[in-house]
Structures are given as C-alpha cells and as structure tokens.
Amino acid sequence: MTTLNSSNTLSSTFYLSGIPGYEEFHHWISIPFCLLYLVGIMALVGNAVLLILVRAEKNLHEPQFCFLAMLALTDLGLSLSTMPSVLAIFWFDVRDIGLNACLTQMFFIHTLSSVESGVLVAMAFDRLVAICAPLNYTKILTHYTVACLSGAALIRGATLLAPLPFFLRTFPFCGANILSHSYCYYPDMLNLACGDITFSSAYGLVFVLCTFAVDVVFILASYMKILDTIMKLETQDRNWRSLHTCACHLCTVLVFYLPLISLAVLHHYTQDTSPILYTTMSNAYLLMTPLLNPLIYSLKSRQIQAALRKRFWVQRVIAGE
C-alpha cells in the first residue's frame, strides 16, 4: 500500500487554475495581470541594477547596502520562481505542472519569502542603530554582525521550510489535483492530500506565526523607537525627511506581510474566501514588493543616486569618445 501511494504521489500532475471559477474570463482578466507581471519584469531589472551598483561601488560596501543587495537578490529569486508559471497561465494557457517541479517551486517561494522577512528585520535593526545610536553604529554593525544576520536569515528559511516537501511526499494525491493559485502554494497543495494533514497543516501555520508574525512585531517596534527618536530631534527638515523615509519603508513592509500572513490564516480557517481575493493577495506580495523595494529602499538613497549618476555619466563620456 505504501509503495502504491508513493508511486501515485510521484506521478502526480497538478493543474494551476489561476483564478478558479473565472476561467472563462481569463482572456480579459489577463490584461491587468499581464500589466502587473510586466511590472514584475521591471522589478527584475531594478534589482539587477542594484546588485551591480553595490558590487561595483566601494562606497556602497556598508551594512545597509549589503542588506539591500541581499534583499535585491532575494527579490530576484522570488520573481524568477513565480513569474514563469504565472505568465504561462495567463499568456499561453499552460497550466499543468509535475509534482517535482511544483514542490521545487513551492520550496523556493516559501524559503525566499522567509529569507526576505529576515532581511527586512536586519534592515530595520540597521536603521534602528543608525538613528538611535549613530555613534556606536560601526561598533555594533561590524562585518561579522552583518554576516551573522544575513546567514541567520538564510539558514532559518532553508532549515524550517525543508520539511514541507517531505510532508507532502508522505501523502497520496487523489482527485483532480487542481490548485487554486497561479503557482504552487503549500496550504493549497496540502488541501489536495489524502490522509490526516492535521500535523502538517499546524506546522505550516505555526511557522508563519512564529517567524513572519514575530518579524513584524520586531520591525514595528524598531520603527516605533525610530519615530520616537526622530520626534525628539530639533531640526524640522530632518524630522520631515526621516519621517517620510520611515513611512515609505513601513508601507513596503505592510505590502509584503499583510497578504502573506492573511493568506496563511485564511487557508487554515476558511474555504469560502473569494478566489479573486486569494489570487490578488498571493500575487501582491510576490510581485509588488520586488518592484517597490528598489524604488523605496534604493532610489531614495542619496548614495545610490550618486552611484547611478556616476555610472551613467561615465558611460556617456565613453560613448562620446
């Protein structure tokens, strides 16, 4: 019986429905979604440019820009993990995906999301030290500390999410194997498994609450402390500039975390949510944040702007010669 189940599981093919219940309208729905995914291509370009700049400019080899580079690399991974299957659905109506490919995509999406969450925590800590303890910044955020924070984010994501594909492989998949997303999502796949999924489902929910929820609390606490420090500054212009930067950062954090945590909770507790809401939320944090991060965190940085101007000026001079 175990051999049969294993064989059935390994030969399973899944069907990515995109927006379940609205398949006949996909031709029209694809227009705004395709625009969103074209924006995702812009996100790929923006993050690639950021990585090149941080690597090329020595004055950008500072903790905050190291975290920015890691964030850009994570965003690149998220975009490349999701965009192919999403574009295949809406542009070419290709919906079938094998179990191995589905498990691989699911692992990378969830792992990279966890890594990005850890990087956002590290970036919040970086800003906390820079604004609240500027004189001790270089003492606290040494190269060793930056390496430890980056490594912890990567190891946490890979280690805690490694069991998910193995959980799914222990179950046979009997039925139509229709996934209600445009990519492979753990709770979605788990709902198609035959057997007792109580532990596997609880593990997924506890992971989300104990990582992403804890990260959100730390980030919000950090920015509250930052705002408290900023409000005590005397220079009104500095107040406005710092407040504006913090507000932009918080908006990006909310765009990433709210859909992610809401999706996990809704999948666990209800099956009656509108499929359009599911699809919109699932694509918001996977496609919008890779676009917003270079704009919010990078282009607002004077050092990044200076590096961009320098690079373009050099290219123009070379072209002129």
Tell what function each PLM region has.
Residues M1-E321:
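Transmembrane helical core of 7TM receptor-like proteins
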